[in-house]
């Protein structure tokens, strides 16, 4: 049955066509076939050499409409900073007790923040957090003394992005239930940040291709040049 549903909605998408951003997001919401609230994911292939240290593309942005889901936040902090994190709405705050829980297999959270003085403690679980993209990092604002602000930003739906070894940025930008207009706004915010993050040493075409898809739906290609121009970030 799932195969039949996919085949039925896939007919609505011309796999050879590159759509406008507006067309693409209307299509991706229309062609999300599952009964559950599917995630909407984008993949942007960049014309960079990810092996070069000066051609890394990464950053963090606040999406205008959040991610359409509850974000569970863990904070490694002590004393006044522990209280600050709790007041801001952190789901779990601690130190060695959190390390013990994580070492025991507990990973029921989406984001991890730490104060700088706690990084020696966090390093004990680096091999667990790192491969899952959960390791606190000062470059994306998750190693900070401003834990209250960081928790608030994560709860609102801050998106961390980075290029992978294949030169592609993969990102989830929301849920089907948010509707095409809000998803489009979130995408344009991400795209603008990626355009601004173009490495100075990158030569040739920067945005090579863009595709968007729901969890169970077909991929929809987006015309990259027009989309980038619409961000006003060139």
Swiss-Prot record:
Keywords noted in UniProt: Repressor, Ribonucleoprotein, Ribosomal protein, RNA-binding, rRNA-binding, Translation regulation, tRNA-binding
A GO term for molecular function: structural constituent of ribosome
Domain of life, per lineage: Bacteria
UniProt feature coiled coil, ranges: none
GO biological process: regulation of translation; translation
TM region positions: none
GO cellular component: cytosolic large ribosomal subunit
InterPro entries: Ribosom_uL1_bac-type (IPR005878), Ribosomal_uL1 (IPR002143), Ribosomal_uL1-like (IPR023674), Ribosomal_uL1/biogenesis (IPR028364), Ribosomal_uL1_3-a/b-sand (IPR016095), Ribosomal_uL1_CS (IPR023673)
Listed SUPFAM superfamilies: Ribosomal protein L1 (SSF56808)
Gene3D superfamilies named among the record's database cross-references: 3.30.190.20, 3.40.50.790
A Pfam family: Ribosomal_L1
Disulfide bond entries: none
Claim: rRNA-binding is one of the keywords in the record: yes
Function: Binds directly to 23S rRNA. The L1 stalk is quite mobile in the ribosome, and is involved in E site tRNA release. Protein L1 is also a translational repressor protein, it controls the translation of the L11 operon by binding to its mRNA.
Oligomeric form and interacting partners: Part of the 50S ribosomal subunit.
Record family assignment: Belongs to the universal ribosomal protein uL1 family.
Name this polypeptide is given: Large ribosomal subunit protein uL1
Gene encoding the protein: rplA
